[in-house]
């Protein structure tokens, strides 16, 4: 990686500002209900503390719209982190909590930090200046520290004060261990993948994935399309899709993508059979529409059928690199989640491939199917990984110091 890593920094006795992603769900009593995001960045936090950093942690939580909201306070996160570090590093590892991310109290608490101690700042989005990337606000954040580390890949596609602006006012900015892992895996997949390279794209809308499809077409050997977006392509081929979701304004583009794939000799796989229902409802009765059959006018496709699962799985089994983003059906309805779960198992079953899974539903599916430990890399950033796969530059990465 051409950017500085935390391992390139002399951390001992330095005040280090680390942007992390602690955007975790809280229950109505303010307790953390899923600490996955905290766990994922623990190796970076532990590395910094073991190397004598005076660590200042910064994150957002939820969308407080630029003003303080006690329901989105990071205080419960500080308490959870305290417990986790107790187990990981040493009993009594204190994590301070500053009730604001700027101002006199934050300054004072940062100055009082000793080697190997951590301070968590209150939700950075309690200030509207964060999302506006306000230079004065970024400068105030930077005044707390000497070095900057970004371990929040999930926010790397945002040019905010704590992800981009701050880097203009610190001596050095480096990637954390989690950020580096993301960039290494996604970078290799897009620049030097082991072949055959198969991309699996799902989700509701073609419009969300156009950039990814167009960028990956030049790199992959096969593209597999599932989910609602597949029906825009099937409609573009002249197939009867009943009441299935499709984007009328994207039909011409879908035709163009299909023609381009054909011209490149690229495999472009679409569903050949379907699981449908008469309404978009979790309790709707599933119907099987076999290969070669049209979807009836009153039915809508909500999942891929067994023939499609077999077709897609056969292609996945040949791959040496797999990137998967987006579900194959309405994954949140149990009756229409089978296709997505089957694809999760197919991806996990190819032990000879490097597999990268991103996006909420795809990640949920690999956990749900009990195969998360068989996936090479589960990406922590849905939007950021998509923009990376589109070939876009991520502001939070570009801002880091070059090696």
UniProtKB/Swiss-Prot annotation:
Pathway(s) this gene product operates in, as recorded in its UniProt entry: Carbohydrate degradation; glycolysis; pyruvate from D-glyceraldehyde 3-phosphate: step 2/5
Lineage: superkingdom: Bacteria
Any GO BP: gluconeogenesis
Chief localization: cytoplasm
EC code: 2.7.2.3
InterPro entries: Phosphoglycerate_kinase, Phosphoglycerate_kinase_CS, Phosphoglycerate_kinase_N, Phosphoglycerate_kinase_sf
Record bears the keyword Cytoplasm: yes
Pfam families assigned: PGK (PF00162)
Record: residues binding substrate: 21-23, 37, 60-63, 125, 158
Gene Ontology cellular component annotations, sorted alphabetically: cytosol
Catalytic reaction annotation: (2R)-3-phosphoglycerate + ATP = (2R)-3-phospho-glyceroyl phosphate + ADP
Subcellular location: Cytoplasm
Annotated family: Belongs to the phosphoglycerate kinase family.
Assembly mode: Monomer.
Protein name per its UniProtKB record: Phosphoglycerate kinase
Organism: Koribacter versatilis (strain Ellin345)
Lineage: Bacteria, Pseudomonadati, Acidobacteriota, Terriglobia, Terriglobales
């Amino acid at each position: 990686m051409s950017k500085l890593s935390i391992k390139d920094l002399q951390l001992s006795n330095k005040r280090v500002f680390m942007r992390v992603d602690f955007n975790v769900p809280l229950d109505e009593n303010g307790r953390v209900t899923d600490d996955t995001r905290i766990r994922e960045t623990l190796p970076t936090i532990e590395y910094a503390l073991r190397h004598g950093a005076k660590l200042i942690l910064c994150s957002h939580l939820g969308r407080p719209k630029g003003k303080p909201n006690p329901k989105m306070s990071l205080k419960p996160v500080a308490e959870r982190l305290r417990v986790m570090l107790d187990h990981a590093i040493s009993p009594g590892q204190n994590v301070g909590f500053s009730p604001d991310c700027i101002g006199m109290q934050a300054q004072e608490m940062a100055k009082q930090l000793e080697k190997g101690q951590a301070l968590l700042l209150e939700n950075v989005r309690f200030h509207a200046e964060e999302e506006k990337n306000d230079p004065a606000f970024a400068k105030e954040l930077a005044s707390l520290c000497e070095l900057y580390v970004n371990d929040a890949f999930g926010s790397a596609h945002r040019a905010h004060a704590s992800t981009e602006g701050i880097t203009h006012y610190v001596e050095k900015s480096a990637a954390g261990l989690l950020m580096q892992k993301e960039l290494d895996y996604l970078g290799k997949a897009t620049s030097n993948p082991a072949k055959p390279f198969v991309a699996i794209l799902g989700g509701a809308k073609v419009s969300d994935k156009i950039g990814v499809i167009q960028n990956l077409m030049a790199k992959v050997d096969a593209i597999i399309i599932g989910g609602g977006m597949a029906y825009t392509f099937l409609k573009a081929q002249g197939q009867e899709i009943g009441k299935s979701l499709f984007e009328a304004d994207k039909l011409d583009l879908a035709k163009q993508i299909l023609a381009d794939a054909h011209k490149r000799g690229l495999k472009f796989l679409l569903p050949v059979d379907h699981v449908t229902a008469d309404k978009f409802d979790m309790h709707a009765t599933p119907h099987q529409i076999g290969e070669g059959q049209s979807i009836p006018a009153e039915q809508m496709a909500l999942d891929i059928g067994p023939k499609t699962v077999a077709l897609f799985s056969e292609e996945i089994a040949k791959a040496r690199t797999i990137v998967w983003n987006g579900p194959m059906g309405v994954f949140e309805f149990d009756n229409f989640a089978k296709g997505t779960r089957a694809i999760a198992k197919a991806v996990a079953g190819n032990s000879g491939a490097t597999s990268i899974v991103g996006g909420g539903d795809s990640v949920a599916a690999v956990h749900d199917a009990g195969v998360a430990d068989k996936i090479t890399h589960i990406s922590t950033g849905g939007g950021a990984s998509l923009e990376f796969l589109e070939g876009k530059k991520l502001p939070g990465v570009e801002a880091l110091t070059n090696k």
